[in-house]
């Protein structure tokens, strides 16, 4: 990474992970995969590993949250690595865990080592889950709500994506910056907030060939 001039690298855990599954073997496999990824990330010098907690469709939200907390405790038990675990906000499809600030806060508060776990804020997922990011005022309100509910000290990285799907649609559909339902006004405010100056930005827009243009858009907004 040093040779490639990469200061901070991040890992995304596999999408099949489900700490809220009704099946014990799925939960255990998910725990092992995340722990292995954390250890691997530490060995590689990666900054953090983000993951989606999973779906509670077979057990209900209350039980699902308890299972995720149990999973987090097992993942973090004895862990001494440098790669930080991050919960990424979800778009809210089905019975997923972690599609609201309140649910993420409950996971961090409930886990034994929750103070060591951070958050990845994906703009498209948040928008699809009902957090408005289209205007200066709506972005400021959303970030204020995040700070009040979770705490900006827990926010480590932003996945910066416009949204192909409508506001509060609960659909995970990324779009290139300025071409989606969020628009550039919100992103201009987001990248200019001093309260987020400590946060890294990662683009997850769909077409690799157009991502350089998205990067230029972000730089111009600043």
Regions found by a protein language model. Name each.
Residues 14-16, 54-56, 88-94, 124-128, ...:
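Active-site beta-loop-alpha junctions enriched in small/polar residues
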Residues 62, 97-105, 127-198:
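Gly/Pro-rich active-site loop or hairpin
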Residues 2-9, 16, 23-25, 79, ...:
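Terminal, non-globular segments
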Residues 9-13, 49-51, 85-87, 117-122, ...:
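Hydrophobic faces of well-ordered beta-strands that scaffold small-molecule active sites
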Residues 19-118:
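Active-site acidic/histidine proton-transfer and metal-coordination neighborhood
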Residues 209-222:
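C-terminal helical cap(s) of enzyme catalytic domains, especially alpha/beta-barrels
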Residues 2-5, 77-83, 111-116, 149-153, ...:
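Short helix-capping segments at alpha-helix termini
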């Amino acid at each position: 990474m040093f040779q490639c001039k990469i200061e901070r690298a991040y890992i995304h855990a596999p999408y099949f992970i489900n700490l809220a599954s009704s099946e014990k073997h799925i939960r255990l496999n998910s725990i092992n995969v995340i722990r292995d990824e954390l250890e691997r990330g530490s060995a590689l010098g990666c900054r953090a590993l983000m993951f989606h907690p999973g779906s509670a469709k077979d057990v209900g939200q209350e039980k699902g949250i308890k299972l995720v907390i149990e999973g987090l405790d097992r993942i973090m038990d004895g862990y001494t690595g440098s790669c930080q675990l991050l919960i990424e906000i979800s778009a809210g499809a089905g019975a997923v865990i972690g599609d609201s600030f309140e649910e993420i806060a409950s996971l961090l508060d409930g886990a034994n080592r929750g103070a060591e776990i951070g958050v990845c804020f994906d703009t498209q997922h948040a928008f699809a889950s009902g957090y408005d990011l289209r205007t200066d005022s709506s972005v400021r309100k959303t970030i204020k709500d995040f700070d009040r509910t979770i705490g900006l000290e827990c926010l480590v990285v932003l996945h910066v994506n416009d949204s192909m799907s409508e506001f509060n649609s609960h659909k995970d559909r990324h779009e290139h910056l300025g071409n989606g339902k969020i628009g550039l006004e919100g992103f201009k405010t987001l990248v200019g907030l001093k309260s987020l100056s400590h946060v890294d930005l990662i683009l997850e827009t769909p077409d690799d060939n157009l991502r350089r243009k998205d990067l230029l858009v972000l730089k111009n907004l600043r």
